[in-house]
């Protein structure tokens, strides 16, 4: 398994949330989204139903806004 150096920056510009990412960053967001989409209904009712992109987790660029991707209960 190779180490991916992803770059993700989340900002708010002119009334819009903007996510800027390199290819590895976009793949990371896609992987997280795919994993959330594959949760079972019972897993979706647990804390496993979301993922944080925040500076404290070192998974976004410095100065980024926090981003949470959540599986909405269907």
Predicted regions and their residues:
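Positively charged, low-complexity terminal tracts
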Residues: 1-74
